[in-house]
């Protein structure tokens, strides 16, 4: 795509931010990752519990669940901790459910056995795309946690059936663009989050017009951008998992 845009970052329409995935970022979790989409930075951990929720007892399968949060000063101005307010915001609940759905789409939960994989995504710096970065990083953390289950003989076969990653797209300055940062997200005409698997299947598409409706042609262009961007992200995941320390 050669469309000329006036993106605040100076990126071309189809250009991702610099993406980095750092494994084994914290000491205690079975899987831990620092994922960076430009200036957006998220710590993703995967922890194993040898139990399942009550609704899955005696069912012979496991569960994967996710939680999401932001440090008070992850954004331009400080926000109170949700624990101090006594409740999670609707946004937080929506995002952590999305992360859980995205990862469960590539898990065979029966192979996991009667245990739970807890995914925690904590945003330490936000510049747009925190939910998509969380999904992309959390998958790598989950892979490392599963590798430990395999290495210790607690499971015989990996429950992971494919890769999964996510990216944002939108219409900015009249042009479909990939991987919106905060400045673009706050000014765009359309904002869309797309989750896809390694084999090209769609897990979730969240799209909203921010005042100016988008056409079917624009939606198709956005999905094409997202598909190409996610293919690059999955290549980054594979590169990280193949790096020393796997």
Curated annotation (Swiss-Prot):
Lineage: Bacteria, Pseudomonadati, Pseudomonadota, Betaproteobacteria, Burkholderiales
Name of the protein: Ribonuclease PH
Subunit structure: Homohexameric ring arranged as a trimer of dimers.
Reaction it catalyzes: tRNA(n+1) + phosphate = tRNA(n) + a ribonucleoside 5'-diphosphate
PROSITE patterns associated with the record: RIBONUCLEASE_PH
EC number: 2.7.7.56
Record flagged with keyword Ribonucleoprotein: no
Positions annotated to bind phosphate: 91, 129-131
EC main group: transferase
């Amino acid at each position: 795509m050669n469309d000329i845009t006036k993106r605040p970052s100076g990126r071309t329409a189809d250009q991702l931010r610099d993406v980095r995935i750092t494994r084994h970022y914290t000491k205690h979790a079975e899987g831990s990752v620092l994922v960076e989409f430009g200036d957006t930075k998220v710590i993703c951990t995967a922890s194993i519990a040898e139990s399942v929720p009550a609704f899955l007892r005696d069912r012979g399968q496991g569960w994967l669940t996710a939680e999401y949060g932001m440090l008070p000063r992850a954004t331009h101005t400080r926000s109170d901790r949700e624990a101090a307010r006594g409740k999670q915001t609707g946004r937080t609940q929506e995002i952590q459910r999305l992360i859980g759905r995205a990862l469960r789409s590539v898990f065979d939960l029966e192979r996991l056995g009667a245990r739970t994989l807890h995914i925690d995504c904590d945003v330490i710096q936000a510049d747009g795309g925190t939910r998509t970065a969380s999904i992309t990083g959390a998958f790598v953390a989950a892979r490392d946690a599963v590798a430990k289950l395999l290495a210790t003989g607690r499971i015989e076969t990996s429950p992971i059936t494919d890769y999964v990653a996510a990216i944002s797209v939108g219409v900015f300055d009249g042009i479909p663009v990939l991987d919106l940062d905060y400045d673009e997200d706050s000014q765009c005409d359309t904002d869309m989050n797309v989750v896809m698997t390694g084999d090209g299947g769609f897990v979730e598409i969240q799209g909203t017009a921010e005042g100016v409706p988008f056409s079917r042609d624009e939606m198709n262009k956005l999905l094409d951008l997202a598909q190409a961007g996610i293919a690059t992200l999955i290549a980054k995941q594979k590169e990280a998992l193949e790096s020393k320390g796997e």
